[in-house]
Structures are given as C-alpha cells and as structure tokens.
Amino acid sequence: MAKINDNYLKLKAGYLFPEIGRRVRAFAAANPEAKVIRLGIGDVTQPLTPTILKAFHEAVDDLASENSFMGYGPEQGYDFLIDAIVEKSYKPLGVDLKTTEMFISDGSKCDCANILDIFALDNTVAIGDPVYPVYNDTNVMIGRTGDADDKGYYKGLVYMPCTEENGFFPAYPKEKVDMIYLCFPNNPTGAVATKEQLKGWVDYALANDSIILFDAAYEAFITDPSIPHSIYQVEGAKKCAIEFRSFSKTAGFTGVRCGLVVVPEELEGTTSNGEKYSFNKLWLRRQTTKFNGASYPVQKAAAAVYTEQGWKETQANIDYYMENARIIREGLASAGLTVYGGVNAPYIWLKTPAGLTSWDFFDKLLNDCHVVGTPGSGFGPSGEGYFRLSAFGNRDNVVEAVERIKKNLKK
C-alpha cells in the first residue's frame, strides 16, 4: 500500500477556519432569522472594474478566433504584463528590475508555498508570531519540522513574537537563521515597516547570509509616502530578498488568480559543495517544470490595472476598503477597545476586552452582535487575546457591524 506524507498529520492550524465555519453554521441553524455579517475572511466584495473587465472580455474574444488564438503561454509570464509591472509599479519607487527577474503566477499564496522547492530542507527558517498560516504550514508539510508543542510551536522553526510591546515588528533571532519570512503591511496585525526597519533586516540578512522572503501582497494599501512598498527600495535587498505580490486584494482578483514573484539575478545560495548558485535560475527551472503559466485572459486583465483608467478605478476600490478600515478602527476605538492596524493596511487587529480569550470574543460577537471575525490565537500563540477584522466587506454591512458591536459593548 502506498505510504502517505506523514508530515501532514502534524498540522494543527487547519483547525481555525473549519472551526469558525462550524460555529457559524450552528448559530445560523439555531437562529435562522439572524443576519450574520462576516468581517473575518479576507475576501473582497467589490467587482472587477470596467477597464479590467473590458480587457478580460477582449482576451476571451481573442481565443475565439483562429487568427488571435493563444495556446500555451510563456511560463514566466507574458511580456506585456511583466513590462507593465516593471515600468508602472516598480520604477516609480526607484526600483529598476530586469524583466527576467519577474515571474507571473496564479497567486502569491501558491508562490509562498512553492518557493520552498528551491531551498534545501536543512535550512533554518524564522517566521513571525502571529503569522499568515501558509508560512508555517508549508514548512511543516515538506518535513522541515517536528511536532507542535502544547503552545502550537513546531520544533525546527524559529518563531519571532510580534507583540504590542515591540509594535508588532519582530526582533532579530538570537540564533542564526537561513530564511526569514516578513510580511508588510502585515497580515494579520495590520502593522507596517519603515524603510529604516526594513534596512535593519536587510543588513541582518546580508551579515548572516540569510534570505528574506518578503510578502508585499498588501503594498497597494499604503498611503503614507514614507512607508516603502517594496523591500527593493532598501539598498542591498536584491542580494538577499525574494518579493511576492498579489492582484487579489489590489485589483479584486481573489477569484481570478494572479500574482508575481521577483527573484533578482544577483541573489545566490550555496550548493551542498559550497559553491554559489543563482536562485533566479533555480526558480525558472522550477516554474518551467511545474507550472504552465497564468492564463492569457487573466494576464490581459492584470495588465489593464496599469493603464491610466485602470489604475484610477483600482485605486477607487482600494480607497473604498480603506474607508471601511477607518470606520471599523475609529468605531471600535470609540467603544473603548484598543485597536491597531487599519492605517496603510486593510486589517484591524484589536485587543479583546479584559478577561476574554480570542475564542471567547469570537463567541460574544457571534452570539450577541451576529458578527464574525477571526480569533487572533488562530494565527499563532502570540495572537491570543487579539482579534482580526477585515475591511473588505460591503460598506453597509461594515457600518451595521460596527454599530452592533458598539451598542453591545456599551451594555
């Protein structure tokens, strides 16, 4: 009989969202008349913009004609999209990238997982706590860790607590690590990193021959001009960092699927024989073997984001969500809650009222307010006592949810 990958049996974090779903279903069955508002999951609610949709339709029409039909595309992505990203997204930041350093994909979640294919299993990995579960779970799946302890920490991973005391920004590990996951603007805490803070991590990585895996999925939500959108705005980062970006929240592509990875040509690792080798070449080899490229209509739609009208429409949706974030942040703060995030980031990270665990507060919001959020403890032990709310909801629902919470907390 074929053997399974036993590493999957070590996973604990998969419990979070199924448990949320179970509790919500049980509540709905017992309270069929209740209107439940979901501010937990990070899915968008605004439709694709007219310019993006027009490009999508035109690309589909291309597939209907023998003269314009497109079959297999380049695994690295079409030049029309790569060129647009390099010129319209990175150059305005002062970042010069070669087109050969960019790889179009079907989403950054997959990329954050698949990038592990080009790293040796005996690398020491550091992740934040609380953290986007994909970083943790994919390292467990491939066999880099032992079992989780009673707190939920896996043996073999280095956890960097991100707490109220350190401004939700991780301190450098005491031990040497080879790979470091950083996510800014952060999911789930909504924290952002200054250029000086990122420079500290770049300097650390260069001094320790480490590689930073930088998740910039929410960079489009930054409004403060002093906050960097890319780690490559820091000198030296091309020698120590891989960057991930996504169209999911930026352009409403959660159901369309498109992302990108930047792997600089000067980024190198070491072979088992101690020789230097290009990570760019390894990732290209990986992609050409395991990936056939994002679809032509999707890439045409993504390229439309970078047209003048396309970006104007996209920015309007981003502004819509950030207004939601302001409403949530200010509304909950006025109710006496301690609130973080929601500025330069679409997530609000709040402290639960005294005496309530993350799951206690989840149950209170569900049962008393009919509002669903995400318990902070589901993102890691350091998330206990916190709660995440998303700004990606419909405006009317967001306003109503905040009013319900405010009214309940004043009782």
UniProtKB/Swiss-Prot annotation:
Cofactor entry: pyridoxal 5'-phosphate
Pathway, per record: Amino-acid biosynthesis; L-lysine biosynthesis via DAP pathway; LL-2,6-diaminopimelate from (S)-tetrahydrodipicolinate (aminotransferase route): step 1/1
Any one Gene Ontology molecular-function term assigned to this protein's record: L,L-diaminopimelate aminotransferase activity
Positions that bind pyridoxal 5'-phosphate: 72, 108-109, 132, 187, 218, 246-248, 257, 292
Modification type N6-(pyridoxal phosphate)lysine: residues: 249
GO biological process, one term: lysine biosynthetic process via diaminopimelate
Keyword Manganese: no
Family the entry assigns: Belongs to the class-I pyridoxal-phosphate-dependent aminotransferase family. LL-diaminopimelate aminotransferase subfamily.
Name this polypeptide is given: LL-diaminopimelate aminotransferase
Lineage per the UniProt record: Bacteria, Pseudomonadati, Thermodesulfobacteriota, Desulfuromonadia, Geobacterales
